[in-house]
């Protein structure tokens, strides 16, 4: 099993940090389906220090166990990241993850995320500052490099390891690729061979077969599931079962999916409040219903609703119609 410092994961399948997706309630749900580790949404370190309400909400920490309390920080100022890391440790975080992989323009233009891969000197200072600031393990998530000419993830991983970083996750694309093309899992093997700390493969892990292929091609210690978990929080358990037994575990029945969707919907509304919760829940309802009969009509109807009870009734009506078709 994977060990991050003194923390041992129960599974080698990790839920990726995803802005606007991996909030407290989604992490809680996916953890229940067997994720070895769940990571918060990316939080801007400077915003964390000034304690913006949004940043504090993003880092809401699950106290169930250490593998539920991993917070991802972004930023380019070593002292600011260090202070934010210490703040999160004081709030109960058990692992700090550093974002060196986000390709979004607004993040890169602030010289954060994957832009940091272009400055190995600054990267080293950030690693060292974060590790020195806290007693808990610090990890990093990166890409292969900035572009095809600068695939420096193996070098950066070595720098990270020397600085005290305890785990490296690599998305198998460059920043310039964004999410186009296919993730290069074979390249991640170069990172695995460069360091002794755990290496996690990320990118295009959308089903159990791809998870197995990614592990085989990368020789990584585990996989990180991102967009593949949209509307399928149970994917983690399917992958885990397949890797352990070689058997394909079916998705939950539609009846069970209805229970999961209703539970998640209610948790969102309870956590954010009705006015904010309903709009946030809409995207999840869209992902959950994708591929089911008449899902477009369902999504269209839900997107026009603001009353939480009406949305809940619509969810039940939609899934009941799917069940009756079977």
UniProtKB/Swiss-Prot annotation:
Give the EC number: 1.3.1.-
Top-level EC class: oxidoreductase
Q: Which cofactor does it need?
A: FMN
- On whether tRNA-binding is a keyword of this UniProt record, the answer is yes
Q: Which reaction does it catalyse?
A: a 5,6-dihydrouridine in tRNA + NAD(+) = a uridine in tRNA + NADH + H(+); a 5,6-dihydrouridine in tRNA + NADP(+) = a uridine in tRNA + NADPH + H(+)
Task: Cite the binding residues for FMN.
Answer: 17-19, 72, 141, 202-204, 226-227
Q: Mind telling me which InterPro entries this protein's record contains?
A: Aldolase_TIM, DUS-like_FMN-bd, DUS_fam, DusB-like, tRNA-dHydroUridine_Synthase_C, tRNA_hU_synthase_CS
Task: Please list the residues that make up the active site.
Answer: 102 (proton donor)
What keywords is this UniProt entry annotated with?
Answer: Flavoprotein, FMN, NADP, Oxidoreductase, RNA-binding, tRNA processing, tRNA-binding
Task: Mention one GO molecular function.
Answer: tRNA dihydrouridine synthase activity
Please name the NCBIfam families in this protein's record: nifR3_yhdG
Role noted for this protein: Catalyzes the synthesis of 5,6-dihydrouridine (D), a modified base found in the D-loop of most tRNAs, via the reduction of the C5-C6 double bond in target uridines.
Q: Which protein family is it in? A: Belongs to the Dus family.
Protein name (database record): Probable tRNA-dihydrouridine synthase
Species: Rickettsia bellii (strain RML369-C)
